[in-house]
Amino acid sequence: MSLVGGFPHHPVVHHDGYPFAAAAAAAASRCHEENPYFHGWLISHPEMSPPDYSMAPSYSPEYANGAAGLDHSHYGGVPGSGAGGLMQRPVKRRGTANRKERRRTISINSAFAELRECIPNVPADTKLSKIKTLRLATSYIAYLMDLLAKDDQNGETEAFKAEIKKTDVKEEKRKKELNELLKSTVCSNDKKTKGRTGWPQHVWALELKQ
């Protein structure tokens, strides 16, 4: 039966008088021998069709190489365990920078330790910070310069008193007053004094009041 109108399907009559009909029949027979499935599909019922090959995934080298890794990561496995997932993250090497920083820190700490040993009369149980060490060293240098200015050979390091108290906002004002007192003391004491010499007692009294 034909699909159009339900009329019976008339068979095709081949006429030997037409040369192209014989050529077409020969080509159809060769096609049937080479690909019988395709020929059978052409003459079979319209509802029967070959599988749709357009829906099948095309071959891709990237998909083939990374398929194993993708499957593992999709089902909770370890990502990157397939053939294409063997890449490792580059590790930054900072060993050289760390060694340089460590050597620099050790050098600075050793220099401050040597400077603390040069400051006299510092209690043994006192821990001096770096800024406090620099301030005490500056004060001690000023004291030694004052001794040289007075040309006093009897000055001793025991006369220097290391100040351990915390500095306040009025530190600049206190330094100015201390310098004025030192200048007045130098002017009044023209003659050399015998015995131990050092900072005047009233200067230390002023220091203790701060």
From Swiss-Prot:
Span list, region Disordered: 81-101
Composition skew (Basic residues), residue ranges: 90-101
UniProtKB keywords: Developmental protein, DNA-binding, Nucleus, Transcription, Transcription regulation
InterPro entries (UniProt xref): bHLH_dom, E-box_TF_Regulators, HLH_DNA-bd_sf
Pfam (any one): HLH
GO BP annotations, alphabetical order: heart development; regulation of transcription by RNA polymerase II
Organ and tissue specificity: Heart, liver and spleen.
Principal location: nucleus
Keyword Transcription (UniProt): yes
Residue stretches spanning the membrane: none
Subcellular location: Nucleus
Recorded GO CC terms: nucleus
All copies of domain bHLH, residue ranges: 92-144
SUPFAM superfamilies: HLH, helix-loop-helix DNA-binding domain
Sample GO molecular function, one term: DNA-binding transcription factor activity, RNA polymerase II-specific
Keyword set includes Magnesium: no
Function: Essential for cardiac morphogenesis and for the development of branchial arches. Binds DNA on E-box consensus sequence 5'-CANNTG-3'.
PANTHER family: BASIC HELIX-LOOP-HELIX TRANSCRIPTION FACTOR, TWIST, HEART- AND NEURAL CREST DERIVATIVES-EXPRESSED PROTEIN 2
Complex and partners: Efficient DNA binding requires dimerization with another bHLH protein.
Name of protein: Heart- and neural crest derivatives-expressed protein 2
Organism: Xenopus laevis
Name of encoding gene: hand2
